[in-house]
Amino acid sequence: IDVYRGRIAPLRRWIDYVFYVSFFPQLVAGPIVRARDFIPQIRKPLYVSQEMFGRGIYLIVAGLFKKAVISDYISINFVERIFDNPTLYSGVENLMGLYGYALQIYCDFSGYSDIAIGIALLLGFHFNMNFDSPYKSASITEFWRRWHISLSSWLRDYLYISLGGNRHGKFRQYLNLIITMFLGGLWHGASWNFVLWGMFHGVALALHKAWMSITGRKKGEQSHGIRRVFGVIITFHFVCFCWIFFRNADIHNSMDMLRQIFTVFLSLIHISEPTRPY
């Protein structure tokens, strides 16, 4: 696609192409490395500076800690039990399990990415960082600028823009966002839970774009103070809501978990109701 669009020249040596598509650090779980970023590095003399070596070791150790210590431990000892049988646990326990999964999946994906980036540095190659504190995002649009950055930028450049992006009016832009995230859900797996996950994110992105348009806020404009705090809380909990469907292949399990969690909020509302004097 990049060659067709004229962004890179066709490769003259087949060995460069084979090396690019088979470069092992990023094959398992990313980051997605583009040819125009990687191929020029092949042609440079191999050089690993002391800074690159130190940073590479740090990222590998940090990634292994995230994956093997945090993610795997939380998954085996906490998250799996609750997600597999949500009705056996209280609403609070289900909510804690959901928070645990949010941490687990972040440490899992970002851990793999850190390891890949670290190994690449030891071999003399630079990959872009793939996660940028995504749970600090104050909007769903900001979340997708921080979460799995190589995937979100790939979806933007090769699906969203190819569908027309924002070039054909507001309605078409919102529809393109929903279609892009729908296909992004299918990219994770051809099952209904991933489709729902992608659709939820697509609709949320479209609604946020519409809200930005209505309120006159500019692209990339950051909120501050208490407004940002509320934005972070709302965005995080929306993302967690979507994780329920991402994690559960069984829709019934997802609905059971939502019911259990919903009882927590119902009980809080009941407690907060003022008592009537008799």
What are these regions (language model features)?
Residues 1-269, 276:
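Membrane-embedded transmembrane alpha-helical bundles that form the catalytic cores
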